[in-house]
């Protein structure tokens, strides 16, 4: 049976930067309060770019990076909890924009774990069918579901999209997954139905029960436990020692979660790649944005061993072991 490898990455973030200092003018907070509790310095907020646009731009970059044509794609999966429409799906809209006429397209909703779930679904579909190449996108426009009057949540989130292209290959690539869900604790991170035009500068607000709501302490506890379980499970399946792993690319939610996880695993914090200081929490987009940033910076070399790990609303979690092949 063929192996599956990552052959290209791409990303898009809005140009509009919202700093901690700006947020301190609209809610009772400060740069020091946000920075010391989250590690976030700024985030990108959409000014007209919708989810489809950001997803499409990240897809175009990934296609170029993979040196393929859009009509080479057999599958497009978009992970998002902030679609522009219920139908057509974001994936079908991306298909239209990039001209991927041969692709099967659908969306999934698994919050911050969505990109990992998308990778696992795509790998299964590629291995068990005639399909050869898949585009997986994580894209979020979280600013439209953030309560800009709640200092505990509005400081955390940003907008953006990231993408990866998978292909059947003879090389060693994507090896093992570990994923799961715990709906019994779903009430700790929720969001209701979306409505348009919710920005930090406008009075057009969502109903309060339709914003992102989070029990921070419970999510912190869940995240550290899920990260530790996932990484240890992947180590067991692959027989990798953490010393062999070049990087762990986790969901970019909070620097403290990453620091606590590193301590539990008895490994250095620097093994965890972090860019949340620039982008905040972009949910399903955070891992592929980080992966593309690392690829562009030349931080990953062929045959490097990496682990991707995510956690989020649902509650959901998942991870994957990859031997880098670009």
UniProtKB/Swiss-Prot annotation:
Its main location: cytoplasm. GO terms for cellular component: cytoplasm. Pfam families: ACP_syn_III, ACP_syn_III_C. The active site is at 112, 251, 281. Keywords: Acyltransferase, Cytoplasm, Fatty acid biosynthesis, Fatty acid metabolism, Lipid biosynthesis, Lipid metabolism, Multifunctional enzyme, Transferase. It is an enzyme of class 2 (transferase). Pathway: Lipid metabolism; fatty acid biosynthesis. One of its GO terms (biological process) is fatty acid biosynthetic process. It comes from the Bacteria. It catalyses: malonyl-[ACP] + acetyl-CoA + H(+) = 3-oxobutanoyl-[ACP] + CO2 + CoA. Its EC number is 2.3.1.180. GO terms for molecular function: 3-oxoacyl-[acyl-carrier-protein] synthase activity; beta-ketoacyl-acyl-carrier-protein synthase III activity. Residues 252-256 are annotated as: ACP-binding. The last Arg residue of the ACP-binding site is essential for the weak association between ACP/AcpP and FabH. Catalyzes the condensation reaction of fatty acid synthesis by the addition to an acyl acceptor of two carbons from malonyl-ACP. Catalyzes the first condensation reaction which initiates fatty acid synthesis and may therefore play a role in governing the total rate of fatty acid production. Possesses both acetoacetyl-ACP synthase and acetyl transacylase activities. Its substrate specificity determines the biosynthesis of branched-chain and/or straight-chain of fatty acids. Homodimer. Belongs to the thiolase-like superfamily. FabH family. This is Beta-ketoacyl-[acyl-carrier-protein] synthase III. The lineage of its organism: Bacteria, Bacillati, Bacillota, Clostridia, Eubacteriales.
